[in-house]
């Protein structure tokens, strides 16, 4: 069985992430969506909230698992008995960073493969950072995230303003 891990902060999960998971789920028997704690990044949502949002947003897919993690990615890939990781490349600017990560992961775990998927063109400009910025200023993010994520963003920013 070919299983891959799709790691990310998913703060929050976007339609771009969901598109990548849907396509990966057709290519592999199983996809583990690994939500990184990423405390250094200072995420808006807690790890538990991000895991929950991802689980709900991806509940229509039967061959996926969502989990949080706070360890080396190579250790999670080993634990999940995965073939490697899948990552999205939105633009050339993503490539340099992802190439560096892939090489570092290969140095740490020589058998771990890094696979890259490009997004659907109409989703290529979406990023969690931009979505959060738009939402924080009261903008409409309905084209970029599922309704449940849009509601969670509204609630979170209202909570922060209170």
UniProtKB/Swiss-Prot annotation:
It comes from the Bacteria. It catalyses: (R)-4'-phosphopantetheine + ATP + H(+) = 3'-dephospho-CoA + diphosphate. SUPFAM superfamilies: Nucleotidylyl transferase. Keywords: ATP-binding, Coenzyme A biosynthesis, Cytoplasm, Magnesium, Nucleotide-binding, Nucleotidyltransferase, Transferase. The keyword Cytoplasm applies. The keyword Transport does not apply. Its EC number is 2.7.7.3. Its cofactor is Mg(2+). GO terms for cellular component: cytoplasm. One of its GO terms (biological process) is coenzyme A biosynthetic process. One of its GO terms (molecular function) is ATP binding. It is found in: Cytoplasm. Pathway: Cofactor biosynthesis; coenzyme A biosynthesis; CoA from (R)-pantothenate: step 4/5. InterPro entries: Cyt_trans-like, PPAT, Rossmann-like_a/b/a_fold. ATP binds at residues 9-10, 17, 88-90, 98, 123-129. Substrate binds at residues 9, 41, 73, 87. The record marks 17 as: Transition state stabilizer. Its main location: cytoplasm. Belongs to the bacterial CoaD family. NCBIfam families: coaD_prev_kdtB (TIGR01510), cyt_tran_rel (TIGR00125). Reversibly transfers an adenylyl group from ATP to 4'-phosphopantetheine, yielding dephospho-CoA (dPCoA) and pyrophosphate. Homohexamer. PANTHER family: PHOSPHOPANTETHEINE ADENYLYLTRANSFERASE. This is Phosphopantetheine adenylyltransferase.
């Amino acid at each position: 069985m070919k299983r891959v891990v799709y790691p990310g902060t998913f703060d929050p999960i976007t339609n771009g992430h969901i598109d990548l998971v849907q396509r990966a789920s057709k290519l592999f028997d199983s996809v583990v969506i690994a939500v990184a704690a990423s405390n250094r990044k200072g995420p808006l949502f807690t790890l538990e909230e991000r895991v929950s949002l991802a689980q709900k947003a991806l509940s229509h897919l039967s061959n996926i698992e969502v989990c949080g993690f706070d360890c080396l990615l190579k250790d999670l890939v080993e634990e999940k008995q995965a073939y490697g990781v899948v990552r999205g490349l939105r633009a050339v600017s993503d490539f340099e960073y992802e190439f560096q990560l892939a090489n570092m992961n290969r140095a740490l775990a020589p058998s771990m493969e890094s696979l890259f998927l490009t997004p659907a063109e109409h989703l290529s400009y979406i990023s969690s950072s931009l979505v959060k910025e738009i939402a924080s200023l009261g903008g409409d993010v309905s084209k970029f995230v599922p309704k449940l994520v849009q509601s969670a963003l509204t609630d979170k920013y209202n909570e922060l303003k209170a």
